[in-house]
Amino acid sequence: MLDLGTGTGVLPRNMYSFGAKWTGTDISPEQIEQAKKLSPGMGIGYYAMPAEKIDFPDASFAAATACQCCWYFDHEKLIPQLCRMLKSNGRLLVLCMEWLPFEDKIAGMSEDLVLRYSPTGAVRARRCTR
């Protein structure tokens, strides 16, 4: 599992007990150092690098996550890299935990659009092609 924008490694640490091997990357060396301190003995690999410059071997990961950070990335550069690094049928999970509609007007309008075009909340997946 690859966690992009891992910050202090909250997601890998919380998912560690489920058995997957995690790797976290973040642009901030300070965040990565904190992640390492908070994850002793977990075997989580942390690397300070921009998401667009990750360069792991082909088919290294079954899945990649981006929690609360995807809007910072240059998608034109990142997505081809991820497609290369994900295994066949690999998945990218983008987590965006937005404000509730009554707390933020723009978030509410966004939710209205999502519900209009996907009333069941179903998500369309796209395949990476090589």
Predicted segments with their positions:
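Class I SAM-dependent methyltransferase SAM/SAH-binding core
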Residues: 2-4, 8-53
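Active-site micro-motifs of SAM-dependent methyltransferase domains
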Residues: 51-53, 71, 99
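A short acidic, Gly/Pro-enriched loop at the edge of an enzyme's catalytic core
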Residues: 52-63
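A short beta-strand submotif of the Rossmann-like class I SAM-dependent methyltransferase core
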Residues: 66-67, 75
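A short, conserved alpha-helix within the catalytic core of class I
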Residues: 73-82
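Conserved catalytic/acceptor-binding region of the Class I
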Residues: 83-130
